[in-house]
UniProtKB/Swiss-Prot annotation:
To phage T4 mobB and mobC. It comes from Enterobacteria phage T4. The keyword Nuclease applies. The keyword Acyltransferase does not apply. GO terms for molecular function: endonuclease activity. Keywords: Endonuclease, Hydrolase, Nuclease. This is Probable mobile endonuclease D. The gene is mobD.
Length: 259
């Protein structure tokens, strides 16, 4: 098919109507003969009135003629998704037509986004936008809403089950979980050590020594332990926080030995 010839004939037909809609007794839409995305202007000689069906066909032909124009492919895609005929009915789309426009639109959209992400300015603006509390809240709300839908849950479940059936996936997941848990425990230890270092007092300075003594005495309660170490020159106190820390370290040590 000679798409250019068909397009020109369609435009000639539309030109006969002029541009005054009030003189027509049927629905029409204004169409740029040379679309603005490829250099067209808004002058009257570049405009024509087409019926909804003709307008749809015109953009289909333009997408065929200018196959690598992102703007025209997007316009074509928009007609397929949002177009209506003169009676307000959604424009029907064949499976072949849908596949063609979807694949082309997807490819062009992907290339466009790749080019945009190469721009430092775009990445910076995107980062600022996504960091806004109201935007983050909307994204989170949208994701939670989507994940709570039964069909989405089922799809996720099937995807996870299928993934675990692939060779090596289960082993990799297990290793990642163990690594994550080890990192968590290491950070927790570091955090506790930091807290201990930040505390003042002779009993905190001698923490390791007193912890070993507490273990040797069969982990006495704070009153008994306080009385014992006061005889060693430490101030009289109930040592509540010290014993709490001892118990946390003791439990953690036992858990590590059992794992």
């Amino acid at each position: 098919m000679n798409y250019t010839k068909v397009y020109n004939n369609l435009i000639k037909k539309g030109k006969l109507r002029k541009l005054d809609k009030s003189k027509l007794n049927f629905y029409t839409e204004k169409h740029h003969i040379i679309p603005s995305c490829i250099g067209g202007n808004d002058d009257s000689d570049n405009l024509v009135l087409l019926t909804a069906r003709e307008h749809f066909i015109a953009h289909w032909l333009l997408a065929k003629i200018h196959y690598n124009s992102p703007g025209l492919i997007y316009a074509w895609w928009s007609f397929y998704n949002f177009g209506e005929d003169s009676l307000g009915r959604n424009l029907k789309l064949t499976s072949r037509g849908y596949q063609l426009v979807r694949e082309k639109f997807s490819k062009i959209h992907s290339n466009t986004m790749k080019e945009m992400w190469k721009s430092n300015e775009y990445r910076e603006k995107r980062s600022i936008t996504l960091s806004l509390p109201e935007i983050r809240a909307k994204i989170s709300e949208s994701q939670l809403e989507a994940q709570n839908k039964p069909e989405v849950k089922e799809k996720i479940s099937k995807g996870v089950k299928a993934a675990f059936k692939r060779p090596g996936v289960k082993e990799k997941h297990s290793a990642a979980v163990k690594k994550s848990l080890n990192n968590f425990e290491a950070k927790k230890k570091q955090s506790n050590s930091s807290k201990i270092r930040q505390r003042t007092g002779k009993h905190w300075q001698d923490y390791d020594l007193l912890y070993k003594l507490w273990i040797k005495l069969n982990r006495p309660k704070r009153g008994s332990f306080g009385t014992y170490i006061s005889k060693l020159g430490y101030p009289k106190s109930n040592y509540h926080r010290l014993i709490v820390q001892f118990n946390e370290d003791y439990e953690r040590s036992n858990n590590e030995n059992c794992s």
